[in-house]
Amino acid sequence: MAVKYTPDQARAIESRGQDLLVSASAGSGKTSVLVERVIREIMDDHLEVNQLLVITFTRAAASEMKQRIKQRLQDRLQEETDASQADFLRRQLAEIDTAIISTIDSFCLDVIRRFYFAIDIDPDFSILTDATQIELLKERALRDVENGYLQNEDQAKKDRFLALYDAFAGDSNANSARDLLLDLYQFAMARPNYRAWLQKLAAPYQLETSDVVDSALWQEKIKPYLEEEFSNLADKLTALMAEADFDHEKFAKYQPAFTAFATSLASYRESLATDDPFDRQRELLAACQFDGTLRTNKEIADFVEEAKEVKEAGKQLVFNVYTGFYASSNADQQALLAKGAEIASAAAEVELAFIDRFNELKRADRVLDFSDMEQLAYEILTQDSSNSDLARAYYQSRFKEIMVDEYQDTNALQDGLIQRLKKAGKNNLFMVGDVKQSIYGFRQAEPSLFIAKYDEYGQENSAGKQRIIFAENFRSSQPVTQAVNLIFDSLLTKDFGGIDYQKEGQLKFAAGYDPEAALPTETEVLYQEDSSATDDDGELNQGDLAMVISRIQKLIADQTPIFDPKTGQTRPVSYGDIAILTRSKTSNLDIKQEFDRYGVPLFVMDVQNYFQTFELTVIMSYLKIIDNPDQDIPLVAVLRSPIFNFSSSDLAEIRLVNKSVSFYAALRTYAKKDTDLAARCRDFLAQLQDLRDFSLSHRISELLWTIYERTSFLEIVTAMTNGQQRRLNLTALYERASAYESSGFKDLYQFINFIARMRKNQKDLAQPILSENAGNSVKLMTIHASKGLEFPVVFVLGLEHRYNYQQDITGSYVLDASGLGLSFAYPFDEAEYRADTLANVWLKIAKKQKLLEEEARLLYVALTRAKQKLILAANIKLPARTDLAGLEEKWAKEISAGRLTLLDKMKVAKPLDFLAPALARAKQVKRLGEKAVSDLATGQEGSLVFVHFDPKKDQAQLPDSEAVAASGADLTEDEAAVFKQAEKLYTFSQGGYPYLDASRTTAYQAVSEIKKVFGDPIEDELADSHISELQSANRYLQPIDTEPDFLFQNTVSSAELGTASHLVLQYYDYAKGDKNAIDSCIAGLVEKGRLSQTLASMLDREALSWFVKSDFAKDFYQQPDRLHREENFATILSPKTLFKDFSDFPGKILVHGTIDGYYEAENGIILFDYKTDHVNPRKQEEAIQKLKEKYQGQLRLYERALNESGRLPVLKKYLVLLSCREIVEVD
């Protein structure tokens, strides 16, 4: 049966001689149209298939499209009666496999292989696809560049480099110059002319006049933004004052405050509009104060409430603008911009050096990566040379049409490359996409390219260009399309998202489901009220999951009908029809565990935290102790693993043999005893030494495989739950080790640190979970992974969790396609503070809007995956003194003229903030239904319903142990014993186990871990901490890592600077009596390879010298043998000593740690601990007090350990605050 196309689809298929942009909404059949256009051009226009260039976003999409075209050609061939036409079709079928229907990377590779001589590269290159190898080459290139600058004889060049790194040295968010250079690389490689783009980074900081108001940055970016913001505020204020009858006594008392604020606001706006000097504008904005209190008045309560909102909005706007753009005077702004120009120029210079060195290393190895392919192809097609002319002419004459799928996801470089393939004056470009589904900003996709063409091609006078909109949705049921339109009508506008959704983006229901079928007719907002819910992070709690599991169980129990396109009939929904979409995969492991607990089958599409999986934690710990066995935490992790099976009591017994030495030393001492446990210790130590010897003469990959073989660890993990996946994970680590070695790296320690960096940078090496495990299971995936897919029933989960975009707009820099914003330390009034440049303030705002726009588009993708039923799940946190009705009232008021204002959208902190106003408004206006989960039934009327989940009444059902017992009445004796044990375990899991708290922590704790869990210490004990808080610090659930990263890498964070400072003070030689030897001590550590040159150059040597020259340290020179530094200790404590709400448990917890230093005076011990925490000089006394409270519990642990060791009593405890040069006593 012939397909019936809509008029717009027919135009897209049949139009010729024009550049076409097809804006195809979700589920609108764009792929079918693209395939049909190709077939028509072959059949009707007699184009050869190899005369078409079809660019897709993924290899899977390219393969699918090629297969569809091939199938259609085969169908036409079977029907064809004309011999010549049949021959033509056979030829096209023969050529389809070599036709360029591919990703843009594959096409670029074709360009390079065909015209490599145009840019003089070796044709015998290979493609570097392994992320590990790419990261290794980047590391090497960056290290070479850094060393080159540090050793450069050109002092000016060296100074520029050091100034760049110094600008980021004190960043508390660990954003370093290295981070900037690596981030710059990603942005630069997505630009058509990256050298020119980098060289323009300093442009916004360069002023040609004496007032920042005259700069291009102010006039083109900042001023329009401020005018818009204050215009909106003035409109609100004017409307409010017009509403008030100030002649009436009830309103009269409010008039002076409003009039004064309106007058001062008008003065500032006029000053802004007429470009008054910066300092004058600053003065007028500071005068915009809203004085007076708006007291509640029942007679005019609505006015007072609205007035309060306008007042708060005005105060907040004035505060934000003043502290952002006007925080410093014109003179200081000029100085900041001048320094910013120097840093930006240095960043561009060093970045270009890094790119050149990275390219040199790749060329030396005769390899290219993906970014090379696009850059080199662009270079081939754009150079002013005869060879480039030849390349352009070849492709421009070959391709009669250029088709680009998912055009909204292209970047500037890809778009520039595509434009070079067009012949001047020839309109043969066909682009299809949907800007509402542009969700790959992190890959440098630029939706602005689509929006610009959308606007241009939509104009009546756009000769040779045409815009076509696909609005019909053939995927989703009417309740789904109605809900999507309801939400996005208020969200996507020209000033937020680049498209007017109400006018041009709405979905038109066209799915054609049988109206007689009893299908689900409602989209659900599934919620529970929770005054204790947290929305501060992305972690899902059990309440969220119980709510979703309960709803899934009811869908299955009710046999909710869905339409099955394979049979053309309705059938009951199954688990396999359901998908759960989340913003990130952070909670995947927790979700899987909870679904398993309730017996609901779940297939996880991808699991984060590869390096945190049990098997990788054990093996990486083993590698660490092979490199250096004197590391307590990895050593204990290996001993407790299934390889050796040492119990907590075994470990405690070993530790007690000598509490003052490392665990490795205690283990060796204990092994000399004549006990069964000692024999096991000897076996372990023998194997460890054997592997250490083996590692000296063998490759890392060989070492790994030898561990697997000698320990049978592959077999052990294969026997565990999800064993095949665990085995694949271990195999993947072996393969990465081989790749690491093939790149020229051999050292085990460096490999351990490389893996640590991969984990830190979230470079996950995990293999995909085996697909055959999916079966009839609920599918869990991220929204990104769901793009292009569809499911009968979709749950969108985690709507109350905060976005984490703050990490992109805080710190020392903000980076965007439009430029680089910088923040750095600058001296103000004889004190140094971190200050934002104007460019940084502006880019924070611009980038925040881009990020929020992408989050809104991500929601659009999520909601449009649903075919027949959409369920939005949220755990709603109720503000203090507010019930749900009050919260709904607040949400509904945010909708103005059917839309959220830009100001409100810029305040959004979580997905629910985007959705709730429209949903609440719809509930008010349309009086939509409110139901409980238990009241839901199938086939109900309506398009949107709010479903309240009551945890007490609607709790998800756990597997029924009694039913299991009944079904096992005829079990054999052995089977009955197994069942009895399983039932006991089930009882324990439901709270029957008497020592449940003990299972949530370990019998072996590091002070550093306990310190992270402690809040402020209570007066008479260590801390008022809760056992539940320690779950996040449980070493068997979290990555094990004790090695400081700085030893063999150049990435420098505040924490690493602190650790390095400790290292210097540990090895400083007081015995020589030289108080000026800090420099020589640091030089010695660098020479021995214990400290990198880069980090050494960033240490605060003045602070270190201050301490060793202080009166506090004078005794260290006189009797250095009484000084103890980096002293290991261990002590046994009752759990209740550490955790306030720990249940009664007879066992103990072994706590270990390292004391920075103590000095044995005549009558007792002086204990001290170095701290490098930043201390605000303006609030130094308050900051020091907070530090004392913060570290009091830690020092008391050290005191207790020393007192129990039989040494002299601890007399005093001190914090050595290096950043502010203070030594303070702690009670």
From Swiss-Prot:
<dbReference type="Pfam" id="PF00580">
    <property type="entry name" value="UvrD-helicase"/>
</dbReference>
<dbReference type="GO" id="GO:0043138">
    <property type="term" value="F:3'-5' DNA helicase activity"/>
</dbReference>
<dbReference type="InterPro" id="IPR027417">
    <property type="entry name" value="P-loop_NTPase"/>
</dbReference>
<dbReference type="InterPro" id="IPR014152">
    <property type="entry name" value="AddA"/>
</dbReference>
<dbReference type="InterPro" id="IPR011604">
    <property type="entry name" value="PDDEXK-like_dom_sf"/>
</dbReference>
<keyword id="KW-0347">Helicase</keyword>
<dbReference type="GO" id="GO:0000724">
    <property type="term" value="P:double-strand break repair via homologous recombination"/>
</dbReference>
<keyword id="KW-0413">Isomerase</keyword>
<comment type="subunit">
    <text>Heterodimer of AddA and AddB/RexB.</text>
</comment>
<dbReference type="InterPro" id="IPR014016">
    <property type="entry name" value="UvrD-like_ATP-bd"/>
</dbReference>
<dbReference type="InterPro" id="IPR038726">
    <property type="entry name" value="PDDEXK_AddAB-type"/>
</dbReference>
<keyword id="KW-0234">DNA repair</keyword>
<keyword id="KW-0227">DNA damage</keyword>
<comment type="similarity">
    <text>Belongs to the helicase family. AddA subfamily.</text>
</comment>
<dbReference type="GO" id="GO:0008408">
    <property type="term" value="F:3'-5' exonuclease activity"/>
</dbReference>
<dbReference type="GO" id="GO:0005829">
    <property type="term" value="C:cytosol"/>
</dbReference>
<dbReference type="GO" id="GO:0033202">
    <property type="term" value="C:DNA helicase complex"/>
</dbReference>
<dbReference type="GO" id="GO:0005524">
    <property type="term" value="F:ATP binding"/>
</dbReference>
<dbReference type="InterPro" id="IPR000212">
    <property type="entry name" value="DNA_helicase_UvrD/REP"/>
</dbReference>
<dbReference type="InterPro" id="IPR014017">
    <property type="entry name" value="DNA_helicase_UvrD-like_C"/>
</dbReference>
<keyword id="KW-0067">ATP-binding</keyword>
<dbReference type="GO" id="GO:0016887">
    <property type="term" value="F:ATP hydrolysis activity"/>
</dbReference>
<keyword id="KW-0378">Hydrolase</keyword>
<feature type="domain" description="UvrD-like helicase C-terminal">
    <location>
        <begin position="505"/>
        <end position="788"/>
    </location>
</feature>
<keyword id="KW-0547">Nucleotide-binding</keyword>
<dbReference type="InterPro" id="IPR011335">
    <property type="entry name" value="Restrct_endonuc-II-like"/>
</dbReference>
<protein>
    <recommendedName>
        <fullName>ATP-dependent helicase/nuclease subunit A</fullName>
        <ecNumber>3.1.-.-</ecNumber>
        <ecNumber>5.6.2.4</ecNumber>
    </recommendedName>
</protein>
<dbReference type="Pfam" id="PF13361">
    <property type="entry name" value="UvrD_C"/>
</dbReference>
<feature type="domain" description="UvrD-like helicase ATP-binding">
    <location>
        <begin position="3"/>
        <end position="477"/>
    </location>
</feature>
<keyword id="KW-0540">Nuclease</keyword>
<dbReference type="GO" id="GO:0003690">
    <property type="term" value="F:double-stranded DNA binding"/>
</dbReference>
<dbReference type="Pfam" id="PF12705">
    <property type="entry name" value="PDDEXK_1"/>
</dbReference>
<comment type="function">
    <text>The heterodimer acts as both an ATP-dependent DNA helicase and an ATP-dependent, dual-direction single-stranded exonuclease. Recognizes the chi site generating a DNA molecule suitable for the initiation of homologous recombination. The AddA nuclease domain is required for chi fragment generation; this subunit has the helicase and 3' -&gt; 5' nuclease activities.</text>
</comment>
<feature type="binding site">
    <location>
        <begin position="24"/>
        <end position="31"/>
    </location>
    <ligand>
        <name>ATP</name>
    </ligand>
</feature>
<keyword id="KW-0238">DNA-binding</keyword>
<keyword id="KW-0269">Exonuclease</keyword>
